[in-house]
UniProtKB/Swiss-Prot annotation:
Protein family membership: Belongs to the DXR family.
Protein's recorded name: 1-deoxy-D-xylulose 5-phosphate reductoisomerase
Pathway field: Isoprenoid biosynthesis; isopentenyl diphosphate biosynthesis via DXP pathway; isopentenyl diphosphate from 1-deoxy-D-xylulose 5-phosphate: step 1/6
Pfam families xref list: DXP_redisom_C, DXP_reductoisom, DXPR_C
Its EC number(s): 1.1.1.267
Positions that bind 1-deoxy-D-xylulose 5-phosphate: 124, 150-151, 175, 198, 211, 216-217, 220
InterPro entries reported in the protein's UniProt record: DXP_reductoisomerase (IPR003821), DXP_reductoisomerase_C (IPR013644), DXP_reductoisomerase_N (IPR013512), DXPR_C (IPR026877), DXPR_C_sf (IPR036169), NAD(P)-bd_dom_sf (IPR036291)
Length: 394
């Protein structure tokens, strides 16, 4: 029986993963080693019961008594806190879903790779902050990383069986978010509610706002660089409002291989769960005649400066990605709290990168996770200062 763990089980990716696992037979088909979640204890306990999980972990120690009570008599072990989540990753599983949002997902993902099994990576911050270290850890342990972002899953599939030396360019698509047709002045004055109203995808607040600012796409450009190893000048993003084409790969013979799929994360999750084969996934099928047209345009970097900043990070490499991600997370916190404006987020990130670029760690290829965490901490402090100054100017 195949074993699995789901980190971030109660988030949107975790819920979709749980749904697919249950459709494939649940506890009759899989041995669930570990499930982790946040404060939604009721849902975490429901999942643990349904999958007969060996271990359930909440990220918050104060929620542990409630989890213990909810799973009393089931035989499922319970634990709480960040250290408990990291230790859960030390339990070997054939297939692990890494879906914890933000830099918090880095530690369990790294530890899971050391078993030499398969890591389905939905946590893009892991590749952005520590891509070179992550990929090296996978190689050294004979582990496989499968991308779960719809764009990177699409690139992965388009490259199957291909000679990467013949790849001329990789194009990932962006919906453009809710502001794709807004003027710069209108974007500058947008509210949190407007920023989180995504036109195509059903997502959480933070990732929806990241999509609106195109910071999500900026992270994905860096992720493409780290996962597939292509030079920055061969990686680009285009705005594709229909969200049907997820990525394209251009080859040296002039051919362009495109991957089309529904705007449903279960497609990419299902591919990772069924890999190296394919299996039934309950998503809508594409009717090209009904769609009628697919459109593409280049993004406006004046309105969406995150893309320009991403190219700087792709060129610098080292731990610049860790600084970029940390600054982005702090800037997003301040925007959601109403302390800075929407366009101030990019300014905070740019000022943070400039401020920490003189640190020896900035351009260094990390040898250990501690270096990644040190740069993350340094950049967060710098970003807090930059955001504070922006707030004073409002």
């Amino acid at each position: 029986m195949r074993s699995l763990s789901i980190f971030g089980a109660t988030g949107s990716i975790g819920e979709s993963t749980f749904d697919l696992v249950m459709r494939k037979g649940g506890p009759e088909a899989f041995r669930t080693v570990a499930l982790t979640g946040g404060r939604n204890i009721r849902r975490l306990a429901e999942m643990a019961r349904a999958l007969k999980a060996e271990l359930a972990v909440t990220a918050h120690e104060d929620c542990l008594p409630a989890l213990r009570e909810a799973l009393a008599g089931t035989g499922t072990e319970v634990a709480g806190g960040a250290q408990a989540i990291a230790e859960a990753a030390d339990r070997p599983a054939d297939w692990t879903m890494s879906a914890i949002v933000g830099a918090a997902g880095l530690v369990p993902g790294m530890r899971a790779l050391k078993h030499g099994r398969t890591l389905a990576l939905a946590n893009k911050e892991s590749l952005v902050t520590a891509g070179q270290l992550l990929m090296r850890t996978a190689r050294e342990n004979g582990a496989t990383i499968l991308p779960v972002d719809s764009e990177h899953s699409a690139v992965f599939q388009a490259l199957a069986g291909e000679d990467t030396a013949c790849v001329e360019r990789v194009i990932i698509t962006a919906s453009g978010g809710p502001f794709r047709d807004w003027s710069l002045e209108r974007i500058r004055a947008c509210t949190v509610a407007e920023a989180q109203a995504h036109p195509n995808w059903s997502m959480g607040q933070r990732i929806s706002i990241d999509s609106a600012s195109m910071f999500n796409k900026a992270l994905e450009l860096i992720e493409t660089r780290e996962f597939f190893g292509f030079e920055p000048d061969r990686i680009e993003a285009v705005v594709h409002p229909q969200s049907i084409v997820h990525a394209m790969v251009g080859f040296c013979d002039g051919g362009l291989m495109a991957h089309l799929g529904p705007a449903d994360m279960r497609h990419a999750i299902g591919f990772a769960l069924n890999w190296p084969g394919r299996g039934e996934v309950p998503v809508a099928r594409i009717d090209l005649a009904q769609i009628a047209s697919l459109t593409f345009q280049r993004p406006d970097e004046e309105r969406f400066p995150a893309l320009r900043l991403a190219r700087d990070v792709m060129a610098a490499r080292g731990l610049s990605g860790a600084a970029f991600n940390a600054a982005k997370e702090i800037a997003l916190d301040h925007f959601i709290a109403g302390r800075i404006g929407f366009l101030d987020m990019a300014a905070v990130v740019e000022e943070t990168l400039a401020g920490v670029s003189t640190d020896p760690l900035f351009g260094k290829v990390p040898d250990a996770l501690e270096e990644v965490l040190a740069m993350d901490h340094l950049a967060r402090r710098a970003a807090e200062e930059a955001a504070g100054l922006r707030q004073q100017k409002r």
